Amino acid sequence: MLKGFLRLLGQTLSILMSFVLLIIVLGILAFGIGTGIGSSISTETLEPDLYTFVFGDESSSNNLLKINVEGVILGSPPQGDLYWFSEEGLVYGYDIQDILIEAAKDSSVKGILLNMQTPGGTIFGSRAIFDGIKLYREKTGNPVVAYVQGMSASGGVLAMVGANEIYADHGSLVGSIGVIGDTLTYFNKPTAIDGGILGGGIVTKEGIEQTIVSAGKGKDLGNPFRRPTKEELKLLQDDVNHEYDLFVKHVAENRNMDSKVIREQMGAHVFDNESAKKFGLINGTLNYRDTVKRLAELAQIETDDYQVVQTATKNHGLLSALLGVFQPKSAPPKVSQIKSQFCNKLSRLPLVYYGNPLRLCSH
């Protein structure tokens, strides 16, 4: 019986060693291919290009880089996040900026097409995109064109006004130059939370009390069991007013608009294409293909001698590639995770967002 057990153990170890050796051999082979060994084998699928082809003349050396700004704009992904962009409604401004910085080093990129589909988001995330656009233009002298497909509101406007020109597709909405500050809740004489007996909440005869221990004047601002003071509300309003002043100045300077018109006539409304053009928010109405053609014209590229490309999927390393077949693919963040991440930003941050952000956090 002992001999049988030892024989089985030996066979198991032999299989494990064979598997490890196979991984090592595959790793050496992949490394060799990448450095020229085994050059007769195509490396196309083993070394993904920096960009992937979208449309145009695939043989052209003139790249027009398409960058998607789709969803709520945040700053940077959480630590350990393997995704450049969430597939379910978030975009990270500093990731967009990084792409623009790298594009500025690539002489094959002759221009940038920003594909805008966003209600806005955080100020710093939106500003990161704007700063990336300005850096790219200053470093290269190449054009950047923003293309609005449906909506670019609030933080989207803050970001895209750095482009040379802005075009919106038919039926789009552009605008919402405004800032949303703190949203404070106050429970006035509460006797239940979360719907009471019908909603599975808590009901008491004497109401619900909550005590927050804090130090520093106004540190417990946001406690729903006390009203904010007039002084606290004024401070919050002053902060929002300051950010709004900066926003108006930013748009006015970069789009050559009158700040008085923005404040008194436009407000924080969104506009159809005709009105947006009249105010100077966009240069006109163009569809996707015609916007690309306009970008090629600004880049002084001969007719049709270009290809539209976008950034390739991020490579997570050789070991991941080798073991990927044995591992389940990482699922994209769940909607609940996305909502939680965004809702955490709402506590004290001023937002450049179109609509009521609390609706994203209401379920």
Which residue ranges define each predicted feature?
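Short beta-strand/loop segments at the ligand-binding rim of alpha/beta enzyme cores
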Residues: 135-146, 253-260
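Structural detector of well-ordered beta-strand residues that form the stable sheet scaffold
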Residues: 145, 167-168, 282
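Small-residue-centered hinge/linker elements
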Residues: 1-140, 157-158, 163-248, 308-363
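Glycine-rich beta-to-alpha transition loops that act as phosphate-gripper elements at the mouths
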Residues: 145-153, 265-268
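Amphipathic alpha-helical segments at domain termini/boundaries
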Residues: 211-238, 242-247, 252-294
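Glycine-/small-residue-rich active-site loops that bind phosphorylated ligands and cofactors
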Residues: 120-121, 152, 283
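Short, surface-exposed acidic
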Residues: 200-211, 255-265, 301-307
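Extended hydrophobic/aromatic segments used for targeting, binding, or gating
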Residues: 286-323
